[in-house]
Amino acid sequence: MRHRDDVAAILGVAQVPMRTRIPEMTYPVLLATVAMRAVEDAGLTRQEIDGLLLAQAPTATLGVDEPQYWGIAGLPGAHAFLGRVHVAAASGLSAVRLAASYVACGRAKHVLVVAADLADEGDSLRGALAQMHDPFTSGQAPINAITAAALQSTHYMATHGVSERSFASPIVKNRLNGARNPLAQLRKPVTAEEVLDSPVLSWPIKRLESSPRTSGAAAVVVGKANSSRAVRIEGFGNFAGAKSIGAQMVPGWTSYLDGSDVKQAARRAYSAAGMTNPQQELDFVEVYASFSIFELLSIEGLGLCPAGEAARRINEGEFHRGSALPVNATGGATCGNPISAGALVRIADATAQLRGEAGDCQVEIRHGRAVVTAIGGLFQTHEVGVLAI
Protein backbone atom coordinates (compact mmCIF):
# COMPACT_ATOMS: atom_id res chain seq x y z
CA MET A 1 0.00 0.00 0.00
CA ARG A 2 1.29 3.43 -0.95
CA HIS A 3 0.74 6.27 1.52
CA ARG A 4 0.62 9.83 0.15
CA ASP A 5 -0.91 12.95 1.61
CA ASP A 6 -0.83 15.02 -1.58
CA VAL A 7 -3.62 13.24 -3.46
CA ALA A 8 -7.38 13.70 -3.33
CA ALA A 9 -9.18 11.36 -0.99
CA ILE A 10 -12.54 10.52 0.51
CA LEU A 11 -12.47 12.09 3.98
CA GLY A 12 -16.06 11.57 5.07
CA VAL A 13 -19.16 9.68 3.97
CA ALA A 14 -22.75 9.34 5.09
CA GLN A 15 -25.99 7.82 3.91
CA VAL A 16 -29.47 7.31 5.29
CA PRO A 17 -31.38 4.01 5.37
CA MET A 18 -33.04 3.47 2.00
CA ARG A 19 -36.82 3.17 2.03
CA THR A 20 -39.70 3.42 -0.39
CA ARG A 21 -40.72 6.70 1.23
CA ILE A 22 -39.30 8.97 3.90
CA PRO A 23 -42.39 11.04 4.79
CA GLU A 24 -40.83 12.65 7.85
CA MET A 25 -38.24 14.52 5.74
CA THR A 26 -38.57 17.09 2.98
CA TYR A 27 -35.98 17.15 0.22
CA PRO A 28 -33.90 20.00 1.72
CA VAL A 29 -33.99 18.42 5.18
CA LEU A 30 -32.83 15.10 3.74
CA LEU A 31 -29.96 16.80 1.90
CA ALA A 32 -28.92 18.79 4.95
CA THR A 33 -29.07 15.77 7.25
CA VAL A 34 -26.82 13.55 5.16
CA ALA A 35 -24.49 16.45 4.30
CA MET A 36 -23.78 17.35 7.91
CA ARG A 37 -23.24 13.70 8.82
CA ALA A 38 -20.59 13.41 6.10
CA VAL A 39 -18.88 16.61 7.27
CA GLU A 40 -18.85 15.27 10.83
CA ASP A 41 -17.49 11.93 9.63
CA ALA A 42 -14.64 13.82 7.96
CA GLY A 43 -13.79 15.51 11.25
CA LEU A 44 -14.54 18.93 9.77
CA THR A 45 -16.87 21.83 10.46
CA ARG A 46 -19.28 23.40 8.01
CA GLN A 47 -17.04 26.46 7.80
CA GLU A 48 -14.21 24.31 6.37
CA ILE A 49 -16.25 23.26 3.33
CA ASP A 50 -15.34 25.53 0.42
CA GLY A 51 -17.04 23.67 -2.40
CA LEU A 52 -20.47 22.11 -2.86
CA LEU A 53 -21.59 19.84 -5.69
CA LEU A 54 -25.10 18.46 -5.99
CA ALA A 55 -25.32 15.18 -7.89
CA GLN A 56 -28.70 14.96 -9.54
CA ALA A 57 -30.67 12.63 -11.76
CA PRO A 58 -33.65 14.00 -13.76
CA THR A 59 -35.08 17.16 -12.19
CA ALA A 60 -38.51 15.61 -12.59
CA THR A 61 -37.73 13.16 -9.79
CA LEU A 62 -36.96 15.90 -7.26
CA GLY A 63 -40.05 18.09 -7.14
CA VAL A 64 -37.89 21.24 -7.03
CA ASP A 65 -35.80 23.26 -9.47
CA GLU A 66 -32.19 24.40 -9.03
CA PRO A 67 -31.75 22.88 -5.55
CA GLN A 68 -27.99 23.47 -5.60
CA TYR A 69 -28.59 27.14 -4.77
CA TRP A 70 -29.89 26.19 -1.34
CA GLY A 71 -26.27 25.58 -0.38
CA ILE A 72 -25.08 29.15 -0.92
CA ALA A 73 -25.79 30.27 2.65
CA GLY A 74 -23.78 27.36 4.02
CA LEU A 75 -20.56 28.17 2.15
CA PRO A 76 -17.87 30.21 3.90
CA GLY A 77 -17.32 33.08 1.49
CA ALA A 78 -17.00 34.54 -1.97
CA HIS A 79 -14.17 32.21 -2.99
CA ALA A 80 -16.23 29.06 -2.48
CA PHE A 81 -17.96 27.43 -5.42
CA LEU A 82 -21.07 25.39 -5.96
CA GLY A 83 -22.52 23.49 -8.87
CA ARG A 84 -24.68 20.65 -10.07
CA VAL A 85 -23.67 17.51 -11.95
CA HIS A 86 -26.35 15.69 -13.93
CA VAL A 87 -25.50 12.51 -15.81
CA ALA A 88 -28.38 10.51 -14.37
CA ALA A 89 -27.30 7.59 -12.16
CA ALA A 90 -23.61 8.31 -12.81
CA SER A 91 -23.95 11.82 -11.33
CA GLY A 92 -22.45 10.92 -7.95
CA LEU A 93 -19.25 9.38 -9.29
CA SER A 94 -18.89 12.11 -11.92
CA ALA A 95 -19.28 14.75 -9.20
CA VAL A 96 -16.65 13.09 -6.99
CA ARG A 97 -14.30 12.98 -9.99
CA LEU A 98 -14.86 16.71 -10.47
CA ALA A 99 -14.39 17.38 -6.74
CA ALA A 100 -11.10 15.44 -6.78
CA SER A 101 -9.83 17.59 -9.65
CA TYR A 102 -10.69 20.78 -7.74
CA VAL A 103 -8.79 19.51 -4.70
CA ALA A 104 -5.82 18.26 -6.72
CA CYS A 105 -5.34 21.60 -8.50
CA GLY A 106 -5.73 23.64 -5.31
CA ARG A 107 -9.05 25.26 -6.27
CA ALA A 108 -10.65 23.94 -3.08
CA LYS A 109 -9.60 22.27 0.15
CA HIS A 110 -12.77 20.38 1.05
CA VAL A 111 -15.59 19.69 -1.41
CA LEU A 112 -18.92 18.29 -0.27
CA VAL A 113 -20.78 16.13 -2.80
CA VAL A 114 -24.38 15.37 -1.87
CA ALA A 115 -27.41 13.74 -3.51
CA ALA A 116 -30.89 12.65 -2.53
CA ASP A 117 -34.09 11.27 -4.03
CA LEU A 118 -37.59 11.18 -2.58
CA ALA A 119 -39.70 8.66 -4.46
CA ASP A 120 -43.02 10.36 -3.68
CA GLU A 121 -41.99 13.86 -4.77
CA GLY A 122 -41.62 15.18 -8.28
CA ASP A 123 -43.15 13.93 -11.50
CA SER A 124 -43.49 10.39 -12.73
CA LEU A 125 -40.12 8.68 -13.04
CA ARG A 126 -41.52 6.59 -15.87
CA GLY A 127 -42.41 9.75 -17.76
CA ALA A 128 -39.00 11.28 -17.17
CA LEU A 129 -37.15 8.18 -18.34
CA ALA A 130 -39.37 7.90 -21.41
CA GLN A 131 -37.96 11.22 -22.64
CA MET A 132 -34.32 10.07 -22.54
CA HIS A 133 -34.18 8.36 -25.94
CA ASP A 134 -33.24 10.01 -29.21
CA PRO A 135 -36.41 10.50 -31.30
CA PHE A 136 -34.45 10.89 -34.54
CA THR A 137 -32.72 7.50 -34.46
CA SER A 138 -35.03 5.58 -32.16
CA GLY A 139 -38.19 6.65 -33.94
CA GLN A 140 -41.32 5.27 -32.36
CA ALA A 141 -39.48 2.48 -30.54
CA PRO A 142 -40.60 2.45 -26.88
CA ILE A 143 -37.11 2.96 -25.49
CA ASN A 144 -36.64 3.69 -21.81
CA ALA A 145 -34.30 2.39 -19.12
CA ILE A 146 -36.16 -0.91 -18.74
CA THR A 147 -36.64 -1.73 -22.42
CA ALA A 148 -33.07 -0.71 -23.24
CA ALA A 149 -31.77 -3.05 -20.54
CA ALA A 150 -34.03 -5.77 -21.93
CA LEU A 151 -32.38 -5.36 -25.33
CA GLN A 152 -28.99 -5.67 -23.67
CA SER A 153 -30.20 -8.85 -21.97
CA THR A 154 -31.46 -10.51 -25.15
CA HIS A 155 -28.26 -9.55 -26.96
CA TYR A 156 -26.24 -11.10 -24.12
CA MET A 157 -28.29 -14.31 -24.31
CA ALA A 158 -27.87 -14.57 -28.07
CA THR A 159 -24.17 -13.73 -28.01
CA HIS A 160 -23.16 -16.10 -25.23
CA GLY A 161 -25.75 -18.85 -25.59
CA VAL A 162 -27.11 -18.50 -22.06
CA SER A 163 -30.68 -18.56 -20.77
CA GLU A 164 -32.66 -15.95 -18.86
CA ARG A 165 -31.83 -17.92 -15.71
CA SER A 166 -28.41 -16.26 -15.84
CA PHE A 167 -29.98 -12.97 -14.79
CA ALA A 168 -31.29 -14.46 -11.56
CA SER A 169 -27.79 -15.29 -10.32
CA PRO A 170 -26.69 -11.75 -9.29
CA ILE A 171 -30.05 -11.12 -7.62
CA VAL A 172 -29.87 -14.20 -5.39
CA LYS A 173 -26.33 -13.24 -4.37
CA ASN A 174 -27.14 -9.60 -3.76
CA ARG A 175 -30.28 -10.27 -1.74
CA LEU A 176 -28.23 -12.49 0.59
CA ASN A 177 -25.81 -9.60 0.99
CA GLY A 178 -28.58 -7.04 1.40
CA ALA A 179 -30.07 -9.07 4.23
CA ARG A 180 -26.96 -8.19 6.24
CA ASN A 181 -27.09 -4.48 5.38
CA PRO A 182 -29.18 -2.33 7.76
CA LEU A 183 -29.23 0.48 5.18
CA ALA A 184 -30.71 -1.64 2.36
CA GLN A 185 -34.32 -1.21 1.28
CA LEU A 186 -34.90 -4.85 0.27
CA ARG A 187 -33.49 -7.22 2.87
CA LYS A 188 -35.34 -10.46 2.18
CA PRO A 189 -33.34 -13.26 0.46
CA VAL A 190 -34.90 -14.75 -2.68
CA THR A 191 -34.39 -17.92 -4.68
CA ALA A 192 -33.69 -18.15 -8.40
CA GLU A 193 -37.18 -19.59 -8.89
CA GLU A 194 -38.76 -16.61 -7.14
CA VAL A 195 -36.82 -14.25 -9.38
CA LEU A 196 -37.78 -16.08 -12.56
CA ASP A 197 -41.44 -16.35 -11.50
CA SER A 198 -41.77 -12.63 -10.73
CA PRO A 199 -43.76 -10.49 -13.21
CA VAL A 200 -42.11 -9.63 -16.52
CA LEU A 201 -41.36 -5.93 -16.98
CA SER A 202 -39.87 -6.18 -20.46
CA TRP A 203 -38.76 -9.67 -21.47
CA PRO A 204 -36.47 -11.12 -20.29
CA ILE A 205 -36.28 -8.69 -17.35
CA LYS A 206 -38.40 -9.67 -14.35
CA ARG A 207 -39.50 -7.41 -11.54
CA LEU A 208 -37.02 -8.91 -9.07
CA GLU A 209 -34.17 -8.35 -11.55
CA SER A 210 -34.81 -4.61 -11.42
CA SER A 211 -34.04 -2.11 -8.68
CA PRO A 212 -36.96 -0.79 -6.63
CA ARG A 213 -38.19 2.80 -6.53
CA THR A 214 -36.22 4.20 -3.61
CA SER A 215 -35.96 7.24 -1.38
CA GLY A 216 -32.52 7.86 0.04
CA ALA A 217 -29.52 10.15 0.25
CA ALA A 218 -25.73 10.02 0.47
CA ALA A 219 -22.88 12.49 0.80
CA VAL A 220 -19.11 12.41 0.37
CA VAL A 221 -16.43 14.90 1.45
CA VAL A 222 -13.35 15.09 -0.79
CA GLY A 223 -10.06 16.65 0.35
CA LYS A 224 -6.34 15.91 0.66
CA ALA A 225 -5.40 12.50 2.12
CA ASN A 226 -4.21 13.83 5.46
CA SER A 227 -5.76 11.46 8.00
CA SER A 228 -5.57 7.77 8.85
CA ARG A 229 -9.23 7.28 7.83
CA ALA A 230 -8.80 8.91 4.44
CA VAL A 231 -9.49 6.69 1.43
CA ARG A 232 -7.32 7.78 -1.48
CA ILE A 233 -8.70 8.27 -4.97
CA GLU A 234 -6.11 6.47 -7.10
CA GLY A 235 -7.70 6.92 -10.47
CA PHE A 236 -10.83 7.56 -12.49
CA GLY A 237 -11.88 6.36 -15.89
CA ASN A 238 -14.77 7.79 -17.85
CA PHE A 239 -16.24 6.85 -21.18
CA ALA A 240 -19.13 8.73 -22.75
CA GLY A 241 -20.58 8.28 -26.17
CA ALA A 242 -23.67 8.59 -28.31
CA LYS A 243 -25.79 5.49 -27.87
CA SER A 244 -29.01 4.67 -29.63
CA ILE A 245 -31.09 1.72 -30.74
CA GLY A 246 -30.47 3.12 -34.22
CA ALA A 247 -26.73 3.46 -33.72
CA GLN A 248 -25.88 1.06 -36.52
CA MET A 249 -27.52 3.48 -38.96
CA VAL A 250 -25.25 6.39 -37.99
CA PRO A 251 -21.56 6.27 -39.08
CA GLY A 252 -19.20 6.47 -36.14
CA TRP A 253 -21.80 5.52 -33.54
CA THR A 254 -21.60 2.20 -31.74
CA SER A 255 -24.10 -0.11 -30.14
CA TYR A 256 -24.61 0.00 -26.38
CA LEU A 257 -25.63 -3.64 -26.29
CA ASP A 258 -22.30 -5.34 -25.63
CA GLY A 259 -21.17 -3.31 -22.60
CA SER A 260 -17.84 -2.47 -24.23
CA ASP A 261 -17.88 1.04 -22.77
CA VAL A 262 -17.27 -0.40 -19.30
CA LYS A 263 -14.03 -1.87 -20.63
CA GLN A 264 -12.94 1.52 -21.96
CA ALA A 265 -13.65 3.30 -18.66
CA ALA A 266 -11.97 0.51 -16.66
CA ARG A 267 -8.87 0.58 -18.84
CA ARG A 268 -8.45 4.30 -18.16
CA ALA A 269 -9.05 3.94 -14.42
CA TYR A 270 -6.60 1.05 -14.10
CA SER A 271 -3.98 2.97 -16.03
CA ALA A 272 -4.38 6.02 -13.78
CA ALA A 273 -4.06 3.80 -10.70
CA GLY A 274 -1.08 1.86 -12.04
CA MET A 275 -3.00 -1.42 -12.06
CA THR A 276 -2.30 -4.29 -14.43
CA ASN A 277 -4.16 -7.27 -12.94
CA PRO A 278 -7.47 -6.34 -11.29
CA GLN A 279 -8.25 -9.92 -10.27
CA GLN A 280 -5.09 -9.97 -8.14
CA GLU A 281 -5.01 -6.33 -6.99
CA LEU A 282 -8.56 -5.71 -5.74
CA ASP A 283 -10.25 -6.69 -2.49
CA PHE A 284 -13.82 -6.08 -3.67
CA VAL A 285 -15.91 -4.24 -6.25
CA GLU A 286 -19.04 -2.10 -5.90
CA VAL A 287 -20.79 -1.88 -9.27
CA TYR A 288 -23.86 0.18 -10.04
CA ALA A 289 -26.36 -2.32 -11.43
CA SER A 290 -30.00 -1.29 -11.44
CA PHE A 291 -30.69 -4.40 -13.53
CA SER A 292 -28.96 -7.75 -13.23
CA ILE A 293 -27.60 -7.55 -16.79
CA PHE A 294 -25.56 -4.51 -15.70
CA GLU A 295 -23.78 -6.52 -13.04
CA LEU A 296 -22.87 -9.31 -15.45
CA LEU A 297 -21.54 -6.86 -18.05
CA SER A 298 -19.69 -4.87 -15.39
CA ILE A 299 -17.96 -7.92 -13.91
CA GLU A 300 -16.81 -8.94 -17.36
CA GLY A 301 -15.99 -5.41 -18.53
CA LEU A 302 -13.84 -4.80 -15.45
CA GLY A 303 -11.72 -7.78 -16.45
CA LEU A 304 -12.78 -9.99 -13.54
CA CYS A 305 -13.77 -12.91 -15.78
CA PRO A 306 -14.15 -13.67 -19.50
CA ALA A 307 -17.22 -12.43 -21.39
CA GLY A 308 -20.29 -14.60 -20.93
CA GLU A 309 -19.02 -16.33 -17.78
CA ALA A 310 -20.09 -14.00 -14.96
CA ALA A 311 -23.35 -15.80 -14.14
CA ARG A 312 -21.71 -19.23 -14.11
CA ARG A 313 -18.93 -17.92 -11.87
CA ILE A 314 -21.51 -16.47 -9.47
CA ASN A 315 -23.36 -19.80 -9.36
CA GLU A 316 -20.06 -21.48 -8.50
CA GLY A 317 -19.53 -19.15 -5.54
CA GLU A 318 -17.26 -16.51 -7.04
CA PHE A 319 -18.00 -12.83 -6.39
CA HIS A 320 -19.96 -13.69 -3.24
CA ARG A 321 -19.21 -12.11 0.12
CA GLY A 322 -16.48 -14.32 1.58
CA SER A 323 -14.98 -15.16 -1.82
CA ALA A 324 -11.62 -13.86 -3.05
CA LEU A 325 -13.23 -10.92 -4.86
CA PRO A 326 -16.75 -10.00 -3.66
CA VAL A 327 -19.01 -7.91 -5.87
CA ASN A 328 -21.69 -5.77 -4.20
CA ALA A 329 -21.12 -7.16 -0.73
CA THR A 330 -23.67 -4.69 0.65
CA GLY A 331 -26.42 -5.76 -1.75
CA GLY A 332 -26.04 -3.30 -4.60
CA ALA A 333 -28.65 -1.21 -6.37
CA THR A 334 -31.19 -4.01 -6.71
CA CYS A 335 -31.55 -3.86 -2.92
CA GLY A 336 -32.12 -0.08 -2.97
CA ASN A 337 -31.57 2.56 -5.64
CA PRO A 338 -32.09 6.27 -4.98
CA ILE A 339 -31.08 7.16 -8.53
CA SER A 340 -29.41 10.52 -7.89
CA ALA A 341 -27.52 9.13 -4.90
CA GLY A 342 -26.88 5.64 -6.25
CA ALA A 343 -23.23 6.20 -7.20
CA LEU A 344 -22.51 7.99 -3.91
CA VAL A 345 -23.96 4.99 -2.06
CA ARG A 346 -21.45 2.79 -3.88
CA ILE A 347 -18.63 5.12 -2.78
CA ALA A 348 -19.90 5.29 0.80
CA ASP A 349 -20.14 1.49 0.97
CA ALA A 350 -16.66 1.05 -0.50
CA THR A 351 -15.20 3.61 1.90
CA ALA A 352 -16.73 1.82 4.89
CA GLN A 353 -15.28 -1.49 3.66
CA LEU A 354 -11.77 -0.09 3.20
CA ARG A 355 -11.91 1.48 6.65
CA GLY A 356 -13.07 -1.80 8.19
CA GLU A 357 -16.35 -0.19 9.27
CA ALA A 358 -18.86 -2.20 7.21
CA GLY A 359 -20.24 -4.25 10.11
CA ASP A 360 -21.92 -7.49 9.07
CA CYS A 361 -21.15 -6.71 5.42
CA GLN A 362 -17.39 -6.42 6.00
CA VAL A 363 -15.10 -8.26 3.58
CA GLU A 364 -11.45 -9.17 4.08
CA ILE A 365 -9.06 -6.36 3.15
CA ARG A 366 -5.73 -7.71 1.89
CA HIS A 367 -4.61 -5.34 -0.85
CA GLY A 368 -6.28 -2.15 0.36
CA ARG A 369 -7.86 -1.38 -3.00
CA ALA A 370 -11.36 -1.44 -4.49
CA VAL A 371 -13.28 -0.36 -7.57
CA VAL A 372 -16.61 1.47 -7.81
CA THR A 373 -18.64 1.99 -10.98
CA ALA A 374 -21.62 3.98 -12.24
CA ILE A 375 -23.72 4.06 -15.39
CA GLY A 376 -25.69 7.11 -16.52
CA GLY A 377 -28.59 7.65 -18.88
CA LEU A 378 -29.29 4.98 -21.46
CA PHE A 379 -25.69 3.81 -21.05
CA GLN A 380 -24.20 7.01 -22.48
CA THR A 381 -21.89 7.56 -19.48
CA HIS A 382 -19.71 5.02 -17.69
CA GLU A 383 -17.57 5.89 -14.68
CA VAL A 384 -14.99 3.68 -12.94
CA GLY A 385 -13.08 4.77 -9.85
CA VAL A 386 -10.22 3.11 -7.97
CA LEU A 387 -10.11 3.73 -4.20
CA ALA A 388 -7.31 2.67 -1.86
CA ILE A 389 -5.96 2.97 1.68
Language model feature labels by segment:
Residues 4-5, 56-114, 118-137, 141-148, ...:
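Conserved catalytic cysteine-centered active-site region
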Residues 1-28, 169, 200-264, 268, ...:
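Condensing-enzyme catalytic core mediating Claisen C-C bond formation in acyl metabolism
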Residues 1-90, 98, 156-163, 185-194, ...:
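Conserved active-site "lid/cap" helical segment
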Residues 255-263, 267-292, 296, 301-304, ...:
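Extended C-terminal subregions enriched in glycine
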